[in-house]
C-alpha cells in the first residue's frame, strides 16, 4: 500500500473461505502477513484512515487481493524412470494448484499441470519439450487457485522451490 496522501494509517481485513478472520489497524503502510498465511488461501483488503482526536475517519475499502502458498514442498527424483515427483502441503481454501517449472529462479516458468486440490502431487518428466538433465537445478512454482464468485483466481505467491537433479 502506498501512502501518497496525508493519512495516519491503514486498516486491513483478512478473510479465509469468505469469513472475516482478523482486522488489523496499523500506522504504517506496510504489514508483514506471512504469519497470517501459514498454509491458507487468504483474501485481504485495506482502507486508509485519518485520526481526528478521539475518532478515526475511514476511507473506502480497496478491492480484494488474494495470497497463499504451500508451507512444505518436497521433491524426489527416480533415476530409473527419470521423473521428478513433487508433493506439497495443503493450502486451506484452494480448489486447485497450478505447477510450473523453470531453470531460473524468477522467470521462464513453463506450466506443467493443474491438479485438483485433493491431489497435491505432480510427476514432472520434462522441462518444456526436453527431458530433465542430470546435475541441473530446476525451480518449481506451486500456485494455489481459489474460487472467487464464479471465477477461478490464481493467488499471488512467494513460493518458489529449487530441486537439483542428482548426477549419478
Give the location of each predicted region.
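An aromatic-rich alpha-helical recognition segment common to small helix-rich domains
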Residues: 1, 12-14, 44-46, 88, ...
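Pro/Thr/Ser/Gly-rich low-complexity, intrinsically disordered linker/stalk tracts
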Residues: 1-5, 55-93, 151-168
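Solvent-exposed strand-loop boundary residues in beta-sheet-rich modules
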Residues: 5, 16-19, 52-54, 92, ...
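Exposed beta-strand and adjacent loop surfaces of beta-rich binding modules
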Residues: 7-11, 41, 83, 94-98
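Recognizes extended acidic, P/S/T-rich segments that occur
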Residues: 11-38, 98-134
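Generic structural motif
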Residues: 23-26, 44, 71-77, 86, ...
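Beta-strand-rich modules
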Residues: 33-56, 127-152
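Intrinsic-disorder/low-complexity, polar/charged segments enriched in Ser/Thr/Lys/Arg/Asp/Glu/Gln
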Residues: 41, 83-85, 121, 137, ...
